[in-house]
């Protein structure tokens, strides 16, 4: 049994041209697998970055809402000035 590109040739009687085509196809599939692995890594990396961005955005929004509520609370609890009192009388 001959060793063809790391695989034991169990297919006796297959023409050499066909075996060469099979080896080329196997190499092409290996390259495709490597490319898909690289794409998967990039996808995972982008996904992680997007999750971080989303979390950061949510935190910033919560901080802005808390700040806005704090300002509204301060405005509602401030004593009214004379002009406010005069406007209320009119």
UniProtKB/Swiss-Prot annotation:
It comes from Branchiostoma floridae. InterPro entries: BBLN_eukaryota. Residues 16-78 form a coiled coil. Residues 81-90 have a biased composition (Basic and acidic residues). Belongs to the UPF0184 (EST00098) family. It comes from the Eukaryota. This is UPF0184 protein. Keywords: Coiled coil. Residues 57-90 are annotated as: Disordered.
